[in-house]
Design a protein with these regions (language model features):
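Hydrophobic secretory-pathway targeting helix
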Residues: 1-39
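Juxtamembrane interface at the cytosolic side of transmembrane helices
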Residues: 2-15, 141-191, 238-260
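Membrane-helix exit/juxtamembrane interface segments
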Residues: 27-59, 185-195
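Long, solvent-exposed extracytoplasmic domains/loops
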Residues: 39-127
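Short, aromatic-rich amphipathic segments at membrane interfaces
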Residues: 113-134, 211-224
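Hydrophobic, well-structured mid-protein blocks that either form specific transmembrane helices
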Residues: 118-157
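Juxtamembrane non-transmembrane "cap" segments at the membrane-aqueous interface
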Residues: 186-210
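Terminal transmembrane helical module of multi-pass membrane proteins
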Residues: 204-255
Length: 260
């Protein structure tokens, strides 16, 4: 019975820690991904507006061609926000409307070889599904986090006796994995970027030879990854600090339960 309690307590603590890790990661992604200040800074840094305007040469829709060719910084920012809303299932169509007209800004043209085409619509549909899966995972993680946190507060004795260090060990393992990914990206970002896309997306439909999408977001990734990593680490440090304070509180002579 005692052994079973220990195993269950450790399992729940591992689930608590993993859910905290995933939630921290989701927050770390969402903060810069929905930040207009971040996008404005990146667009100005990389000269994104002029690069996007130049893609009007590939657009057949006359209204869309004119819109892109004369695009303003605010319109570029609005298009970026629309793309993010699409990925988060807040928009049904990747392309936008202006004055009641649908503008076919994003293309779906298969090239020979495949990566010389522009399968923006197909790829972003896949990205949307990936975001959707991520949101579902985070909702589950939030439920697990709250549930295990409540159980930990209720069953402090079992936590104290069996798994005071489990949070730190589990987070250490998670951080080790994160560190390997981070170091790989720092050494060869193109390799890490390609590997990520080959794991989560089929074929080469994510490789664009031209188009608004790749010119709008292509150079942002090198800027967003360090921000995500920094926010993620800060949130994990807060988690570790919270666990350490909780351990200190329940380990005090006044609160510590007697050992069996």
């Amino acid at each position: 019975m005692k052994r079973a309690k220990g195993v269950l307590a450790n399992l729940l603590t591992v689930l608590f820690t993993l859910s905290a890790f995933l939630l921290a990661g989701f927050i770390a992604v969402i903060v810069p991904a929905t930040s207009n200040s971040f996008y404005k800074a990146q667009f100005r840094k990389h000269g994104t507006l002029e690069k996007v305007r130049a893609q009007s040469a590939y657009i057949d829709d006359a209204d869309a061609k004119n819109y892109v060719a004369n695009m303003t910084e605010e319109q570029l920012l609005s298009l970026m926000n629309h793309t993010m809303r699409y990925c988060l299932y807040l928009e049904d169509d990747l392309n936008i409307e202006k004055d009641g007209k649908r503008l076919e800004i994003f293309l779906d043209e298969r090239g020979e070889p495949l990566d010389s085409g522009c399968l923006e619509v197909t790829h972003m549909s896949d990205v949307k599904k990936l975001f959707g899966a991520g949101v579902i995972i985070c909702i589950v993680a939030a439920v697990v986090f709250v549930t295990t946190l409540i159980l930990g507060l209720i069953f402090k004795k079992e936590y104290y006796l069996y798994c005071r260090k489990t949070v730190f060990v589990t987070l250490g393992a998670c951080l080790a994995v994160l560190a390997v990914i981070g170091v790989t990206a720092a050494i060869n970002f193109d390799f890490a970027f390609t590997l990520f896309h080959e794991i989560f997306f089929s074929g080469k439909q994510w490789r664009f030879g031209y188009g608004v999408m790749i010119n709008m977001i292509g150079e942002i990734f090198t800027g967003i990854v360090p921000i995500i990593a920094a926010i993620w680490i800060v949130l994990l440090v807060i988690t570790v600090a919270g666990a350490a304070l909780f351990n200190k509180k329940i380990s005090s002579p006044k609160n510590a339960p007697p050992r069996p």
